[in-house]
Amino acid sequence: MSPAMLQASSLCVSAALSGAASRPGRLASQGHQGKRAVAQPLAASAVTEAAPPAPVVAPPARPVDAPRRRGGRGGGGGGGELVAWKSVRQERWEGALEVDGELPLWLDGTYLRNGPGLWNLGDYGFRHLFDGYATLVRVSFRGGRAVGAHRQIESEAYKAARAHGKVCYREFSEVPKPDNFLSYVGQLATLFSGSSLTDNSNTGVVMLGDGRVLCLTETIKGSIQVDPDTLDTVGKFQYTDKLGGLIHSAHPIVTDTEFWTLIPDLIRPGYVVARMDAGSNERQFVGRVDCRGGPAPGWVHSFPVTEHYVVVPEMPLRYCAKNLLRAEPTPLYKFEWHLESGSYMHVMCKASGKIVASVEVPPFVTFHFINAYEETDEEGRVTAIIADCCEHNANTAILDKLRLHNLRSSSGQDVLPDARVGRFRIPLDGSQFGELETALDPEEHGRGMDMCSINPAHVGREYRYAYACGARRPCNFPNTLTKVDLVERTAKNWHEEGSVPSEPFFVPRPGATEEDDGVAISMVSAKDGSGYALVLDGKTFEEVARAKFPYGLPYGLHCCWVPRKRNSK
């Protein structure tokens, strides 16, 4: 393809990926010249006080070693690999779980965890953690007992791959292999329309205010509704508005009454802020933030909100339309690093859609924001926004460290890039610059910090505790669970040699008045090839119980909790 054709193709991709580009909105200030800142299942209702039912199918065999990529690309599978990085062997399973310890009797509901679980098709192995087809895991708790399940999410991408034995949609680093030049041209046409983008919803899982459960990824078409009781794929979640766009934040902010999301616009670089009422499929336009730097919007995997404001981050890791056209990925995949473009934090009023602050901040890289809240003066006036995130010291290396051959490496070297709790202070007094500091000594959590949760009652409000994955070094991936105390600036850590825990999801005890009164639940892939749901006391961060699967499960990403009142029949 000629450079001219490539440039034209990139423009077409940008047009396809823009969201609500023609919608009117309020723009962030373009000025501020000056010095740069530095710095899943058996129906849950069937679980009774009686002994749990026996498995309805035999447990799967041990997960299969992933094959080496044809042609020698990528890392292969060996017998010494951890089960966390091996493909799940069976499409679905359900049955009773053996419990060690005592589960709290108040723990009554369903824990769901989503994430990639299938990284190979026949003898073809995928490159990257984020390429895997979605595997939904469920653990239902009741009366001190647990029933577990897993199932593949029936996305169009997964069904097509299963039917044809090859990648048929564009995943994070994988693209369909064209048979000839005409086939390649046809693929470009489908990319421009968005039809070749994946709907593989392997990232998040959320419960909407009306009880519907969605699995999500960064493509809007990858919003898929599932049944939390059966793990059946109900179907695509169809947005009924005309906001458009093909990509959005993988992590919306969801409460009992509303749903907030960001839609990047690659034509006029910026972000559309939208909200949706519980029970509705219609997103409503709230406002627009124009980017202050760079050729494209910064990546927005997640974002925080406060009671009255939406915080829109703009980091130098920016979307790159031309990288979408590549058959082979760059080390930054769909992104480019534009340090010269600056880093910014924008604050929008929820009620009016107006930009109330747009400040330059030191460079940063984050996948996940933890929380945000409003700082007030003695008279109760909001003077600043505090926003915390899992920050990777402005180092983009973490993206390539998540290649599967890196994760499967058993070299024993300390190759996990450092991370910290980064705390932004965004003044609302018209200042040009904001601050970014380290909220606590990173050695408290082994200089690893990601995959976080908090007490849901404190979303958008002042808080003290966060639960996340940390590190015990040397390691190549977060291998501990961490409770962070942001007041005392300390951390408590749980670690089991050779295990790979996933996001610790905090479930508050009903009626609790203290922020850390509850449990943190994490799915753990153990060194011996087994898997279990670990339940830690929210206060002491000591093990309460573990519900053991009869087989090992691959690593997963994000979780949600469905209380019994929501999923009972």
UniProtKB/Swiss-Prot annotation:
Its EC number is 1.13.11.69, 1.13.11.70. The keyword DNA-binding does not apply. Residues 52-62 have a biased composition (Pro residues). Residues 1-43 form a transit peptide. GO terms for cellular component: chloroplast. Pfam families: RPE65. It is found in: Plastid, Chloroplast. Keywords: Chloroplast, Dioxygenase, Iron, Metal-binding, Oxidoreductase, Plastid, Transit peptide. The keyword DNA-binding does not apply. GO terms for biological process: carotene catabolic process; secondary shoot formation; strigolactone biosynthetic process. Residues 23-81 are annotated as: Disordered. It catalyses: 9-cis-10'-apo-beta-carotenal + 2 O2 = (2E,4E,6E)-7-hydroxy-4-methylhepta-2,4,6-trienal + (11R)-carlactone; all-trans-10'-apo-beta-carotenal + O2 = (2E,4E,6E)-4-methylocta-2,4,6-trienedial + 13-apo-beta-carotenone. Fe cation binds at residues 251, 301, 368, 558. It is an enzyme of class 1 (oxidoreductase). InterPro entries: Carotenoid_Oase (IPR004294). Induction: By auxin. Its main location: plastid. GO terms for molecular function: 9-cis-10'-apo-beta-carotenal cleavage oxygenase activity; all-trans-beta-apo-10'-carotenal cleavage oxygenase activity; carotenoid dioxygenase activity; metal ion binding; oxidoreductase activity, acting on single donors with incorporation of molecular oxygen, incorporation of two atoms of oxygen. Expressed in parenchyma cells of the root stele, shoot apex, leaf buds, xylem parenchyma cells of the stem, inflorescences and panicles. PANTHER family: BETA-CAROTENE DIOXYGENASE (PTHR10543), CAROTENOID ISOMEROOXYGENASE (PTHR10543:SF24). Involved in strigolactones biosynthesis by cleaving the C(27) 9-cis-10'-apo-beta-carotenal produced by CCD7. Produces the C(19) carlactone and a C(8) hydroxyaldehyde. Also shows lower activity with all-trans-10'-apo-beta-carotenal producing a C(9) dialdehyde and the C(18) 13-apo-beta-carotenone. The branching phenotypes of the ccd7/max3 and ccd8b/max4 mutants can be rescued by exogenous treatment with the synthetic strigolactone analogs GR24 and 4BD. This is Carotenoid cleavage dioxygenase 8 homolog B, chloroplastic. The lineage of its organism: Eukaryota, Viridiplantae, Streptophyta, Embryophyta, Tracheophyta.
